[in-house]
Amino acid sequence: YKGGYLSRLKYPRARTNLADYQLTPAVTYTWNKHSLGLSGYYHRRKEKIPNITTVQTDPNLKYYTFTGMENADGTTGGYSGFEREFVNHEFGGELSYQYKNERIQTLTTLSYAKGNEDVWGDIKYSPGKYHTTTYNLLSMNRIKSGRTEHIIDISINYQTGKADEYRQEKIIEKDPVTGIESSYWNTLLTYDERYTVDLLNANLHYRLLWSNHHTGEATAYAGARAYFQSVEDQYNLPSSSLTVRQATICMEGGYSFLRKNNRSLWIEAEAGYHISLSSDLSLNDPSTEYAQSVLLPDMTYYGASYAHGKLQIQYQMPVTIKKHTNVWFVKATGAYLKTDKKTDSKMFGISLGLYH
């Protein structure tokens, strides 16, 4: 269960209330070296934005209603008296299988989820509804051989989202006897699946891990990772679309020095290449404010391939404070990225922490 009271006073989205909880009943059955599990869950998320207040005084500030792709209508001062409520109900289930012995441990899960999110305004005015369907496959495998261990992880996630858009009118009725007025919103027209989203993520990770014979502590590793992503956004009536497909291949490795008395020096490196396989944008009206400010400039990012590298050095040691000993660490990280668009980025960071 999670609750929140979010306040953002510098722009008009203040006083957001959040309730988020999930129920997950599950049952498992184990025989010999096998385990079979079945679980279901119900997830409810409600975010409510009451009448907005803000310290923002810019008279030209706009509040946008976004319906998909380049279609975003901005109204100056539109946040005044604005109310919005998002209520999502999601049901799902998961089937899992585990096999475990002295050398091999494997866990495979299949899951399915169906979600429906209602969007409400004042007096239950509703601009639309969003439906999601999610499929997920996860396989985690560990194979031990002497002082080495093979780690093989596979994950595939596919989600499709469909947004229905409503056209409504406000009906006000007055009781002829009491004179009391009541109002409600009547749906005149429904655009079924006016905006659709398809998202596919696939990840493969392999790592060979070396460990100390006596302590079992990891001393070195080498591995590789491959990642693929496909995104398809489609807006209908009028038609606009965005398609992005990209892949990343990465190599990694690390080695631990000076291993003694809870002290060690880890040096880790990573290098890879990100490939933009396709990036296509088709807009019915490329002159809109959102298209000019967001969608069209973003295509430079989506269409870029780049090489990247990362080096990390971490030293850990025991530190005693008031007779309590914890393992502290100091870590320095540097990363570099170079695109085929003649742009690059550099990053350096340092951190200090402890394991508790």
Question: Language-model segments: which ranges?
Answer:
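Transmembrane beta-barrel strand/turn architecture of Gram-negative outer membrane proteins
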Residues: 18-42, 132-155, 245-254
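Outer-membrane beta-barrel "beta-signal"
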Residues: 31, 344-356
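Short loop/turn motifs that connect adjacent beta-strands in outer-membrane beta-barrel proteins
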Residues: 30-37, 100-105, 143-153, 209-219, ...
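Outer-membrane beta-barrel transmembrane strands
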Residues: 1, 16, 82-105, 130, ...
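Internal, well-ordered domain-core segments that constitute the primary functional module
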Residues: 1-70
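Extracellular/periplasm-exposed beta-strand and loop segments of Gram-negative cell-envelope proteins
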Residues: 12-16, 51-58, 65-90, 116-132, ...
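Transmembrane beta-barrel strands of outer-membrane/channel proteins
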Residues: 1-3, 38-44, 108-114, 152-162, ...
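Elongated scaffolding segments in large macromolecular assemblies
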Residues: 86-158, 170-172
